[in-house]
Amino acid sequence: MAARFPILCILESRPEDAIMSSGLLRRLHEEIPQASFTLVGSDASAPLFRDMPNLDDLLVIEGDGRGERFKLWNRVRAQKWGLVVDLRGTDLSGWLSRRKRAVRQPWPKDQPVPHKVIQAARVMQLEDDPPAPWLYTSPETDAEVDEFLAEYAKPGDGPILAIGPGSNWIGKVWQEERFAKVAGTLLGPDGPMSDGRLLIVGEEADREAAHAIRMTVARERVIEAQGRLDRLQTCAMLKRCRMYVGNDSIWTHLATAAGIPVLGVFGPSDETLEGPWGPNGRAVRGPKSMDDFRRHDPRLDQTINHMYDVPVDKVVDAALALHADTEA
């Protein structure tokens, strides 16, 4: 029997970034079956990894300051680690007893900056075969989601279209009426998911903004998950869906980590860095470039909606193409 191989992984604080690097943990688990994991994240990123197989401990450290690193060192210094993976790029691994380490380094200034999945893969020299984002969900989490979904069960239930209309900034929010048109096309009588259901994901605060979307189909075809499922439960729910359409948001990253076809609607954010990953991940944007947005909103933080010029027809066509291309 192979000896236990303890791995310490310091995850990114930003949950979206932690999701984009999550495939590294899956690769480690699959290639080192005897590995056990201690994961370090922030309040926002750590809960996404609570169902990681062979998880010894899940620690929360908010900042990257020396004081925070000392607190973390004091909690993990007694262990001799087989591998330390530091996705925040700190100097902590130099203070620990370990056989190997992989530490994020600044991307070379003379090289074009690639997608964040590739950036994360480079930490472990996997940039030629970057592992796709993936979040593990346990049988317990799956059972919780099944219980939630049972509230909406009815005979002849069809495939589920997930819509994520929220985002963490109004500048990235495509209008709900436009999402409603996308959902109506896919789920309507002549659509490819005419027998399907509509799942709306997001925070409780997003519920009001989704009114037009939920009115797209009959009430009994709508599954309301906003504010009812936490983020990892939402990922488990998304694993049960046929496809997803949403803004650049945590929900779009969760859909990518669920392994389903994903269409992201982008405006003042860069899909070449953070767009849905993989052959079944696609992005649509309007005519403006990132430089165009920054001329009007230099720090990309003003209370301005930048998404009005993303045309409905372009998103509808992309959604129909994604559905057709991923049809079994």
PLM features: residue spans?
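Catalytic machinery of carbohydrate-active enzymes
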Residues: 1-328
